[in-house]
Amino acid sequence: FTGDLADQQVLEEFARRVIQDYGRVDCIVHNALPLMKGIDQCSYEEFNYALRVGVTAPFYLTKLLVPYLAPGASIVNISSSRDRMSQPQTESYTAAKGGIAALTHALAVSLAGKARVNSISPGWIDTDFTSYTGPDADQQPAGRVGNPLDIANMVLYLCSDQAGFITGENICIDGGMTRQMIYHNDF
């Protein structure tokens, strides 16, 4: 299924198709990359688009699927470590990722007894499986840059019964970067 998550009709068609094909929902993973533009380049329309993809779509799709949640269902939202720290010119992305992190704990309370809702905030994740060495790896307390399996393993865990007592949490998977203070000439 392909479509623009910012389009309400696409979300409604997707939800209809899921229920038609499967009848119930065990796990929802919201993982969309909204537009990444900053204050110098991002238009009003682009900023709103980023929020529609990154926050409104997960909210609305969850709303559409709530009546079909199976017992023990889990919802995992993918946020970003940028929900707690920033780089210049990333306001649209940062706002959307901060929004999904806040939506996570709100939904966890509203959906109590129906689904567990958590989010993951990845840090630097190399999707090309490049082996980074030197300063790129050294600055990471974990000693390496993350890879998609680091995130996938947490998603699988949060969707499993083993995580049955975890809800409303935002788990940062960034190799410890948000816990480390870096000053000029530290690395």
Regions found by a protein language model. Give the residues of each.
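C-terminal helical subdomain
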Residues: 119-120, 134-166, 173-175
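Alpha-helical segment proximal to the catalytic Tyr-Lys
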Residues: 67, 108-113, 164
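Substrate-binding pocket helix/loop in short-chain dehydrogenase/reductase
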Residues: 38-51, 136
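Active-site loop immediately N-terminal to the catalytic Tyr-X3-Lys motif
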Residues: 40, 85-91, 143, 148, ...
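Conserved NAD(P)H cofactor-binding loop of Rossmann-fold oxidoreductase domains
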Residues: 31-36, 176
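Active-site helix of classical SDR
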Residues: 62, 96, 104
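Short C-terminal tail/terminal secondary-structure segment
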Residues: 167-187
